[in-house]
Amino acid sequence: KMDQIIAGTIINILATGLTSFFYSQGYVLPAITPKLRIPILADIPLIGPVFFDNGLFTYAALFTALLLWVLLFKTIWGLRTRSVGEKPGSADTSGINVQRTRFINVTLAGALAGLAGAYLSIEAASTFERGLTAGRGFTALAIMIFGAWNPIGAMAAAFFFGLANGVASQLQADEVIAIPQPFIHMLPYILTILLLAIVSGRIDPPASLGNPYPFDFAS
C-alpha cells in the first residue's frame, strides 16, 4: 500500500547494495557472449552492423520489444494489463484481479531490467564493477516516457539515445572534437532533461500510473 515511487527507490538502492556485496565476495564472473553475425545482411551499409552483427542480448532485446507490442495491443492479456493501469476500478468490476495482474507484470518488468543490466556486464563491457550502469536505469524511464509507453516507441527512443551517446564517444575517440570525458558521461542525462522538457504535457501517461489500488483480502 506504500507509495510506489518510494518503494521503487528503496528496491533500487537495495539492488545496488546487493550487487556491491556479491562483487566484493567474488561471486561475479561474467562471461563474454560471442557475436552472431548474419551473413549478407550484416554487409548492408550503415544498418547492417547495427542490426545484424550483435550478441544474443541485443537480438533478444529487439525481439522482446516487438513481442511486447503484440502482446500489449493484440491480446486479451494486453487489454487486461492496460486496463489495470488506466482504470483499475473498472477492471476490478469486470472480474480482473488488479493486484495479481499488476504484481505479475511488475515482476516481468523487473526481470527484463535485470537482463538489461546483464547485457552491460556480459556483452557490452565484458566485465563488472561498482556503478557499471552509471544511472542508465533512470534514462530508461525517460525513454519509456518519450516512447509514449509503447514498446516500439521506447525502442526508437532507445536507438536515439544510443546513437547520440555513440556519436559523441566516437568523435572523442577519433579526436575530431576535444570533448572532455565527464561531458560524455553527462550527455545521456542532458538529452533526457531536454527531451522531457519538450514532451512534458504532450504525452499522457496511464491514468493510474504509480497509484496503488486498494487491496481486497477477498480476492
Residue ranges of predicted features:
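Helix-loop-helix "hairpin" substructures at the membrane interface of multi-pass membrane proteins
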Residues: 50-128, 151-152, 156
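Hydrophobic core segments of alpha-helical transmembrane domains in multi-pass membrane transport
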Residues: 16-20, 58-71, 109-117, 140-143, ...
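Transmembrane alpha-helical segments in multi-pass inner-membrane proteins
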Residues: 124-189
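Hydrophobic alpha-helical membrane-insertion segments
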Residues: 8-24, 144-151
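Alpha-helical transmembrane segments within multi-pass membrane transporters and channels
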Residues: 1-16, 66, 160, 165
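Transmembrane helix-bundle core of multi-pass membrane transporters
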Residues: 4, 15-74, 175-184, 210-219
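Cytosolic-side transmembrane-helix boundaries in multi-pass membrane proteins
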Residues: 86, 92-93, 97-100, 171-219
